A protein has these predicted regions:
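Membrane-embedded alpha-helical bundles that constitute the cytochrome b-like, heme-associated redox core
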Residues: 1-236
Length: 236
């Protein structure tokens, strides 16, 4: 099987299964998914709290539990992303695709516009790809990787705020408030970032199912067993 070394396009058969996503990458994917399932509802409630919480105040710690769940999930989210960055250096080529987009090559751009036309249903593109196709790779980097980094930085800054100026957390993260003007702006941007990543997640799920149905390769299965398998031969 012949594969383009830069874009990952399958150029010629005979086709054979390819081990694409290593176990740490697959584990990271599902850990981040679970963390987001906690972060989104708790983050929404923190940003838009209920007007009142019933019950005896001495026994009601409802909002404290919400904050605690958000903070724990956020730390898992941040540590998992840091480990994912580390694995990009020590893992296989597909593990680096999330962070390195080969925009300097013509074959990548050809695949990018081919996939864009296919997703818009204006042209038929039957290329096969090992790992992410160029359009998916660009979206994963520009929307998910950068969006996740933004959420981690602003989230750590908001977490540090409770310690007060002059403390070690604020000495490390206080520059974020200086950069964006004030804590309220950071809080607003962090809240908007939640909707941004949630929108990406919806689009991501749609594209994954679409690719698994319409493309010539397994997509959902590869994130469970790591293997990319093929349903047809590559285009001539």
């Amino acid at each position: 099987m012949r594969i383009d070394p830069v874009s990952g396009e399958v150029l010629a058969g005979p086709l054979e299964p390819v081990y694409v996503y290593e176990a740490p990458v697959r584990l990271w994917h599902w850990v981040m998914m679970i963390a987001m399932m906690v972060l989104v509802p708790t983050g929404y409630l923190i940003g838009s709290p209920p007007p009142a919480i019933g019950g005896e105040p001495a026994f009601s710690y409802f909002f404290g539990y919400i904050r605690m769940a958000h903070f724990i999930a956020a730390m898992v989210f941040a540590v998992a992303f840091a480990v994912r960055i580390y694995w990009a250096f020590v893992g296989n080529k597909s593990s680096r695709a999330l962070f390195i987009v080969p925009v300097w090559t013509g074959t990548w751009w050809k695949g990018f516009f081919g996939q864009l036309g296919s997703y818009l249903f204006v042209k038929e593109d039957d290329a096969l790809w090992v790992g992410h196709n160029p359009l998916a790779q660009f979206a994963m980097f520009a929307m998910y990787a950068l969006g996740t980094l933004f959420m981690i930085v602003t989230g750590l800054a908001l977490y540090a705020e409770q310690w007060g100026w002059g403390t070690t957390p604020m000495n490390l993260m206080g520059w974020v408030f200086v950069l964006f003007g004030d804590p309220q702006m950071v809080r607003t941007l962090h809240h908007l970032g939640m909707w941004y990543l949630l929108l990406f997640t919806v689009v991501h799920i749609y594209m994954v199912f679409r690719e698994d149905i319409m493309s010539g390769a397994t997509v959902i299965g590869s994130m469970t067993n790591g293997m990319r398998m093929w349903k047809r031969e590559p285009r001539a």
